[in-house]
Curated annotation (Swiss-Prot):
Keywords: Cobalamin biosynthesis, Glutamine amidotransferase. The active site is at residues 333, 431. Pathway: Cofactor biosynthesis; adenosylcobalamin biosynthesis. The keyword Cytoplasm does not apply. One of its GO terms (biological process) is cobalamin biosynthetic process. The gene is cobQ. CDD domains: CobQ_N (cd05389), GATase1_CobQ (cd01750). Belongs to the CobB/CobQ family. CobQ subfamily. This is Cobyric acid synthase.
């Protein structure tokens, strides 16, 4: 007889209602009980992604949830990943591998095929794990997206899994959100909803009780719990760029990051944003790159378009002024490509074939290729006469010819990155390398000679995940969910 697998799907009334965080917390609750648990998200739309053990690509939220489960991330935890590369189009990634580019209408028609991929991955996880915590996408009540849905109730019905609906009370309108979402579901979908969770509550719970009673009476569904607002949680954001936390003590380093239209993997900067002595500022449309010690050009899903956008904002001139005054510039992935002499796209990987003139700050030339590099990397960074171990991951199309000193030596002996002869400009394909304490300390020393004590980024994430799990165990009636 096939062993029963515990499943639960968390759907939300809106985007950013708390689905990712709730699933991560539930995963940690089960992992702490010794349950072999895995996360699953049928379809994700995000520009922040992670590399898996198979050398595939999934949303970063599922990688964090895998960490909460204390397991390695797998492509089957997020079988359909959509990475927007224009206002109407996106790259479609199935089970970790890029398939093609599609517009929204094309993907809508492709969903029936994508569902087969989703169910295949779900079956694989069921064969391997005792429990699967599932995350929906956006809201299940988007009327225009319900046909052939694979992200929310369409999957829940196909896989026959129970559902809870979470809403963010901090935004206001929580009762309308929950009542309205349930009302817009079909009778069979309503039947599989086991209850509601209210997220990010602050205040006296007694003032909420009359509303909870009304909701339960009107819907016939229980409120399984009310989660408090967890200040300073500092988990990686999947989409929205998180603002700078409050600084404490003396600011030793000022960093600015221009927000490109297709910025990707901005989680690279979380370690800077969370440090109490580093002032990290994101600069948006119409703003100038203000005085700083370091300008970082981030990754991009559409490098040539974002290079054009950078120039339209006048940021290229700001960068040159910054360098004249002795500042440092760091480019990561797409930002690294922009720093070179040229970026060519002969195959039309990002749109119309052609070539763009780079910023010319590094002696590199990049050609975008049809194959994507997906790899977790270990090596050594040599900078300022010092050598430290470095870890990170690469997610990019394109190969760069480098005629500069290459400061990173991977464990396989391959050289990576580039450092200008003047020593002010550096680039690398490695995402996540700043998370290493030794690397961050060395980079800060390179920038302006400052010595800071880096925080243990992995430990901070572990503490955040445990805080979520603690709150869930305290405030949710898990017996109603069979957990």
């Amino acid at each position: 007889m096939e062993a029963k697998v515990t499943t639960l799907m968390v759907q939300g009334t809106t985007s950013d209602a708390g689905k990712s965080v709730l699933v991560a917390g539930l995963c940690r609750v089960l992992a702490r009980k010794g349950v072999n648990v895995a996360p699953f998200k049928p379809q994700n739309m995000a520009l922040n992604s992670a590399v898996t053990k198979e050398g595939g690509e999934i949303g970063r939220a599922q990688a964090v949830q895998a960490q909460a489960c204390r397991i390695e991330p797998s492509v089957h935890m997020n079988p359909v990943l959509i990475k927007p590369n224009s206002d109407t189009g996106a790259q479609i990634i199935l089970q970790g591998k890029a398939l093609t580019n599609m517009d929204a209408y094309g993907f809508h028609n492709y969903k029936k095929v994508a569902m087969d991929t989703v169910m295949d991955s779900f079956a694989r996880l069921k064969d391997e794990y005792q429990a699967i915590m599932i995350e929906g996408a956006g809201s299940p009540a988007e009327i225009n997206l319900r046909q052939n849905d694979i992200a929310n109730m369409g999957f829940a019905e196909e896989a026959d899994v129970p559902v809870i609906i979470v809403a963010d009370i901090d935004r206001g309108g929580v009762f309308a959100h929950l009542y309205g979402t349930l009302a817009l579901l079909s009778p069979s979908e309503q039947a599989r909803v086991k209850g509601f969770v209210i997220n990010r509550f602050r205040g006296d719970i007694k003032l909420l009780e009359s509303g909870l009673d009304w909701l339960e009476e009107k819907t016939g569904k229980p409120v399984i719990g009310v989660l408090p607002f967890l200040h300073g949680l500092n988990l990686e954001a999947e989409d929205a760029i998180t603002s700078q936390q409050e600084l404490s003590g003396e600011v030793k380093l000022k960093v600015v990051v221009p927000v490109l239209t297709r910025i990707s993997n901005h989680t690279d900067f979380d370690v800077l944003r969370l440090h109490p002595q580093i002032d990290l500022r994101y600069v948006g449309k119409g703003e100038r790159l203000e005085h700083a010690d370091l300008i970082i050009l981030p990754g991009s899903k559409s490098v040539r378009d974002d290079l054009r956008y950078l120039r339209e904002q006048g940021w290229d001139k700001d960068i040159l002024r910054h360098l004249r005054f002795g500042g440092k510039v760091l480019g990561i992935c797409g930002g690294y490509q922009m720093l070179g002499e040229s970026i060519s796209d002969p195959f039309g990987v990002e749109g119309e074939p052609g070539e763009s003139v780079g910023l010319g700050l590094l002696k590199t030339r990049t050609e975008l290729t049809q194959d994507k590099c997906l790899i977790n990397t270990k090596g050594q960074l040599s900078l300022n006469g010092k050598h430290v171990n470095v870890t990170g991951y690469e997610i990019h199309v394109g190969r760069s010819q480098v005629n500069e000193y290459q400061p990173i030596t991977n464990d396989d002996g391959q050289l990576e990155g580039a450092l200008s002869e003047c020593g002010q400009i550096m680039g690398s394909y490695l995402h996540g390398f700043l998370d290493s304490e030794a690397v961050l300390e060395l980079i800060c020393e390179w920038v302006n000679g400052v010595r800071i004590k880096a925080q243990n980024h992995q430990q901070l994430k572990e503490q955040a995940i445990d805080r979520i799990a603690d709150a869930i165990e305290e405030h949710l009636d898990l017996s109603q969910l069979g957990i």
